[in-house]
Amino acid sequence: MTKYALVGDVGGTNARLALCDIASGEISQAKTYSGLDYPSLEAVIRVYLEEHKVEVKDGCIAIACPITGDWVAMTNHTWAFSIAEMKKNLGFSYLEIINDFTAVSMAIPMLKKEHLIQFGGAEPVEGKPIAVYGAGTGLGVAHLVHVDKRWVSLPGEGGHVDFAPNSEEEGIILEILRAEIGHVSAERVLSGPGLVNLYRAIVKADNRLPENLKPKDITERALADSCTDCRRALSLFCVIMGRFGGNLALNLGTFGGVFIAGGIVPRFLEFFKASGFRAAFEDKGRFKEYVHDIPVYLIVHDNPGLLGSGAHLRQTLGHIL
C-alpha cells in the first residue's frame, strides 16, 4: 500500500498542497488555495486532507519567510503559528516547516533535463556546490552541497545583501533609490517590485516623471518595444540578475551549477536569452575564467517547491535521493 506524506508550498497569496509518495517521491493531487479565504495554514491543511480522504502522518511545508524556531510568522501574510502545536493538532508524527528556497534547492537533485534550460557554461561537476536564486515577490537564495550521500541545503537571506552596482548607470540608479528608500538591497532591484524600482529610477535619472506602472505593465511594454524606459529596465534587470548569479558562483565555487527559479524570468524567456545576462554573469575581472564554465539553468518545473519539500522530507525519513 502506498504511503503518502503531505507537502506544501506557501507564499504570500496562495497555499499549494499535495501528496508525496514517500517511496518514489512522486507528487500528486496538487491543489492551490487562496490564503485570503482561510484563517490559518492549519485550516487549509484540514480542508485539503478532508477533500482527499487520505491518512497522512508526516508533512513538510515550504514557506516564503525565514524559519528560525518553533514560531513562524509569515512575512507577506497574517498567518502565524507554532510548528509543535500545529503538529499536535493535526495528529502528525512528523511535521517540518522549511524556507521556500530550501525546498527549491532540494528539488534540484530530483529535476530531469526537460525541467531545465541552460544559459552558457559547460557541464556541471558532480559533487560540487550548487547555488539557486529566484526573483518573484522578493529575491530568494540558497545553496546546496552533497555530503556523505546526503544533500544539505544552506538557506539564508542572500536576497537582502547590498545591491552592488558595477557601471555608471547602475551607480546612478543606486543613488536615486537610496534617496527614496534608504538601504538598497539586491531584492530592491531583482524582484517584481524591483523591476518597478528600476523603471522609476531610469525615468527619474532623466528628470522626468515615471508612470504608475506594475511589473506586468513594464514587461509587456518592453516586449512590445513600445516604451524605451521599460525595455531599458527589463534589460538592466537581466544584467543585474547575471551579476548577482556570478557573485553566488564565486561565493561557494558552485561548479555544480547556478539555478534560477521564480516566476518572473519565464515570462520573458526569449528576451532573457538575448540579453546581457550571461556576459554579466562572467564579468568578474580577473576571475572571468573561473566562472566561465559554470553552467546556469532556468528551472521550468511547475512545482519545484512541492517537489523539494517532498525530497527534503524523504531524506529526513531515511531515503537516499
From Swiss-Prot:
One cellular component GO annotation, for this chain's record?
A: cytosol
Catalytically driven reaction(s): D-glucose + ATP = D-glucose 6-phosphate + ADP + H(+)
Query: What molecular functions are annotated in GO for this chain?
Result: ATP binding; D-glucose binding; glucokinase activity
Domain of life of the organism in this record?
Answer: Bacteria
Provide the primary localization: cytoplasm
Against Pfam families, the record matches this protein to:
Glucokinase
Instruction: Give disulfide pairs as residue numbers.
Output: none
Which interval of the chain is the signal sequence? none
Q: Where does ATP bind?
A: G8, D9, V10, G11, G12, T13
- EC number, as in UniProt: 2.7.1.2
Q: Which GO terms describe its biological process?
A: glycolytic process
Alphabetical UniProt keywords: ATP-binding, Cytoplasm, Glycolysis, Kinase, Nucleotide-binding, Transferase
Q: Which InterPro entries match?
A: ATPase_NBD (IPR043129), Bacterial_glucokinase (IPR050201), Glucokinase (IPR003836)
Q: Which SUPFAM superfamilies match?
A: Actin-like ATPase domain
Task: Report the top EC class in one word.
Answer: transferase
Q: Where in the cell is it found?
A: Cytoplasm
- Please state which protein family the record places this protein in: Belongs to the bacterial glucokinase family.
| Protein known as | Glucokinase
